[in-house]
Amino acid sequence: KTDRKEEKKNVILGGICCGLALCVASNLQQIGIQYTTVGKAGFITALYIVLVPIFGIFLKKKAGVRIWISVAISVAGLYLLCITDKLVLAKGDILVLLCAVVFTIHILVIDYFSPKADGVRIACTQFFITGVLSAIPMFLFETPRLSDIFAAAVPVLYAGVLSSGVAYTLQIVAQKDADPTVASLILSLESVFSVLGGWVILGQKLSIREIAGCILMFSAII
């Protein structure tokens, strides 16, 4: 009974903490991306690959030399992949940078709670908290209409079910046995797959710079 109570406590507390972090990070990203380029937003958001090992130092989770080398290679790859103009910080960039900080906290919170409770239950609690908290500003600052929701049904369902539901659940389950810095490096491949997806699905052309960025990022993970 004691173990069940402890696990239930960790599910609720972990779900609340993860949900709060995910809500803040997602909203900062979505607001910030309106005031910056997609490339810069992708690069700055993925800076959690640097922030996670830095924050980990204060939590007594020091990363080895090989990990830091991988982080450096990955950042270089991200820069080639995402940045096409000068990196000058604007209003949107600062919001996205704050988003990267909160995503760092999200990864570390998952690292703390995932070994202590069932990952799927934590994920379900996380999504409930994120949904409720995100609904508040939606009704305060937006005018949601069913016609608009139905018009965007496909991207909304994809983002809700696959990009959020499946992906974040797998993240929590997988981080039970994964180092947070390694997890952040793997998660940063999102930028690579988005570019490759545009090439395969949308027929977009890849520049030599982007190909080099993809190679560097895959090399960093390996």
Task: Write out the residue ranges for each language-model feature.
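Transmembrane alpha-helical segments that form core, pore/gating elements
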Residues: 52-53, 88-142
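Membrane-interface helix-cap regions at the ends of transmembrane helices
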Residues: 1-8, 54, 73-89, 129-152, ...
